């Protein structure tokens, strides 16, 4: 027997209602803010992610699914959604239709990580990209969209953490101070931090091992230039005026190299070690880095699997998927075709119908309808058809009535609405 690959999941049954709930909410919220959906390939040229995410990041060094295709090209399953979206923006000359461009995506991503609750090797993200605006209004909008989305899911136990990691000028001075701070601690830090000290010093602040050194490290907000400081203050002021709750975290840097300026993360209080449910920020230099014109941009992404865990942890009721509303059972050769016609009439009126396609007696059909959690059962029998009626049965209470053929749709709809 074949089994699914480690770190992947089969999504079906009762779980599907959570996926529909989150994806439908994401589409509705992005609609309210004028975002259009984009769907990019799940695999791209490896160099796209090396250039964008950063050669020294954990994603590129340890986590990417990379292979050679039959043309000896290096291909990678996408580990995140921003780089493919920006590649599509450049390749398809989307700038020609005007800026800013608002895009969103929902889809699977792939990273070779140690599977655990809320962390899979194939996982799914919802994300937005706001391309073409350098205004603090854009930074605030991204955070507001994220906040409205989470509130629309019914979540309350989450915290938005924000910071500014400044521009290249700010970071140059800050990196010097950070190197000075860690210079006498190199023999004490973890192996990853030893490597990052010379390749990407900011990533030391993201270390989950040497947290005692991180908390006492210099704060980048003390080294922001006037422009970056002004942008950060303007963004916070807008969020304050809109009553968006957030916490400042001067050690927040994010794990991808393309970020600059405003960055943010969202953590949920009931998810333990894997508390991050989303994050984002500015990437003003990414489009130029990937071959386009210098274009200020920003965005965020959220993990759908972790959002589902959060929704369940908070006990948020999620509407059942409205399928299997009616099971149509039939008895006798001459009743089959009429039962099919009745099923199609119900479907024409938006009622979900499961039609019996097996050679079963009535008791077996009713048992199957019960297993499917059908709310109602229509029984179409030869004897009833001779009298121009069918039987409508409530599967929960056992109540049943006879309905004249012409009133099947109306009465069935009434019974569904009453439940």
UniProtKB/Swiss-Prot annotation:
Q: Which reaction does it catalyse?
A: tRNA(His) + L-histidine + ATP = L-histidyl-tRNA(His) + AMP + diphosphate + H(+)
**What gene is this protein a product of?**
hisS
Q: Indicate what this protein is called per its UniProt record.
A: Histidine--tRNA ligase
Originating species: Thermosipho melanesiensis (strain DSM 12029 / CIP 104789 / BI429)
Where found?
Cytoplasm
Q: Which Gene3D superfamilies match?
A: Anticodon-binding domain, Bira Bifunctional Protein, Domain 2
Query: Keywords on this record?
Result: Aminoacyl-tRNA synthetase, ATP-binding, Cytoplasm, Ligase, Nucleotide-binding, Protein biosynthesis
The UniProt similarity line reads:
Belongs to the class-II aminoacyl-tRNA synthetase family.
What does the record list as GO biological process? histidyl-tRNA aminoacylation
Q: Name one Pfam family in it.
A: HGTP_anticodon
